[in-house]
A protein has these predicted regions:
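Short amphipathic alpha-helix that is part of the acyltransferase structural core
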Residues: 1-67, 73-81, 147-201, 231-234
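Intrinsically disordered, low-complexity, positively biased terminal segments
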Residues: 2, 11, 157-403
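Conserved acetyl-CoA-binding loop-helix of GNAT-fold acetyltransferases
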Residues: 84-87, 93-106, 110, 243-254
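Conserved active-site alpha-helix within GNAT-family acetyltransferase domains
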Residues: 110-114, 120-139, 270-285
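Conserved catalytic-core motifs of GNAT/GCN5-like acyltransferases
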Residues: 119, 132-150, 155
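Short acidic/polar capping segments at secondary-structure boundaries
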Residues: 122-125, 131, 146-147, 174-177
Length: 403
């Protein structure tokens, strides 16, 4: 049997061989995709975030991590994004993928990430190590003509003195990366969003520098980016904290209605976009689920945002074989928009909700306790504790980023 070695991929490794492995797993890359992959792969290798499996010195599998923050009720939490996980076709079925992911989970924990997320090509391997379905990307579609006239704000809701305000819109590029990240972050905090990501300035500037991306800043609180996808328009993201700014940005996108028939993009299920169009012809055409892993339960709870009006307390019992530090008897407390998870001295509570790592991930993401129990991801607890946990963790997680 061929010996398989798991080790970090270094800047001195053969990247042509790594590219070949990726294309055997995911298909042929375009010239732009290949250049982007190579740039990111070398960057992650330099950070020690690119892990490889080698059989007799030949690449047999690989995976990489992205350093990100994920917003939970408006609070950014450090997150390791797992990406580009693959095993060479001739080496599949030998446990290489599981060995690779086990070592990757150890690296994530050693680097101090409370959370990890990924888009699964298949779920069993990730579930076996504690990841669970948590949220989704939602693809919207709308006829471009339907964007020509946006619904005016409801005067009854605006109050006396509210009137139209023109918001200046200007082009944005890599030099504006700090302003763009500020606007995106402020937008997520104001909306108390759950699930969306933010990147460091380096990868964000690279994205803003794409030749096929058209991005705009509006006033001091808005940002939008879109690109052409064949004859259609693809909206990468739209952020705003005022109705005027939101309409100014969508008006830029709507100005293409004479040159395209269709507009699509990733969106949130509660994006204000759904309430802006005159007709109900915008629709979700595709939903892609992503998975979450709570790597450090206490740190993840401490970093997460919670509803400010909710006060709750509940005992939990966690069993996490892959991350034993999460295992034990805990007391969850939520108040004033913050949460704590503290050991209760090892004393079991007959009222405790019992969870494995998959149940912890799903609960963290706002899945109702009744759903967890019916899915076999939780047991025990009490009706009062269920209601308190549902109120504390209530969220509708989404992403708009690929990684």
């Amino acid at each position: 049997m061929t010996d398989v070695v798991i080790r970090p991929i270094t800047p001195d490794d053969d990247y042509d061989a790594q590219m070949d492995l990726s294309q055997r797993a995911f298909g042929i890359y375009s010239e732009q995709q290949a250049a982007s992959w190579l740039h990111v792969a070398r960057l992650r290798a330099g950070q020690g975030l690119f892990l490889g499996a080698f059989a007799d010195g030949v690449p047999a599998g690989a995976a990489m991590l992205h350093d990100m923050r994920q917003y939970w009720l408006g609070q950014p939490v450090k997150l390791a994004g797992v990406a580009s996980v693959k095993v060479a076709p001739e080496h599949r079925g030998r446990g290489i993928g599981r060995t690779l992911m086990t070592e990757l989970l150890n690296i994530i924990a050693e680097r101090g990430y409370p959370l990890s997320a990924l888009y699964p090509a298949t779920t069993p391997i990730y579930r076996s190590l504690g990841w669970e379905l948590a949220g989704a990307k939602h693809k919207f579609w709308i006829p471009a003509r339907s964007l020509r006239g946006l619904v005016e704000p409801d005067r009854a809701a605006r109050g006396a003195g509210a009137g139209h305000q023109d918001v200046p819109v200007r082009r944005a590029g890599p030099a504006d990366v700090a302003a763009v990240l500020r606007v995106i972050g402020e937008s997520h905090r104001a909306a108390r969003d759950a699930g969306p990501l933010t990147w460091d300035e380096g990868p964000a500037a690279q994205w803003l520098g794409r030749k096929d991306l058209y991005s705009y800043l509006a006033g001091d609180d808005g940002f939008a980016a879109y690109r052409w996808a064949g004859d259609d328009l693809w909206v990468e993201r739209v952020h705003a904290r005022s109705p005027e700014t939101l309409r100014a940005l969508w008006s830029v996108i709507a100005s293409h209605s004479s040159t395209t028939d269709d507009v699509s993009g990733w969106t949130s299920p509660h994006d204000p976009f759904w309430w802006l169009t005159r007709e109900r012809d915008a629709t979700v055409t595709y939903r892609s689920m992503w998975m979450l892993r709570v790597v450090d339960a206490a740190a993840a709870i401490a970093a997460r945002g919670f509803p400010p009006a909710v006060s709750a307390s509940a005992p939990l019992e966690i069993q996490d074989q892959a991350r034993p530090a999460n295992s034990g008897h805990w007391q969850l407390a939520v108040a004033d928009g913050k949460g704590t998870l503290t050991p209760n001295g090892g004393v079991p509570s007959p009222a405790a909700l019992t969870l494995g790592p998959r149940g912890v991930a799903a609960l963290y993401a706002g899945t109702p306790v009744a759903t967890l129990r019916l899915a076999g991801l939780a047991s025990g607890g009490t009706p009062d504790a269920d209601a308190a946990l549902d109120a504390a963790f209530a969220a509708a997680p989404y992403m708009v980023d690929d990684f």
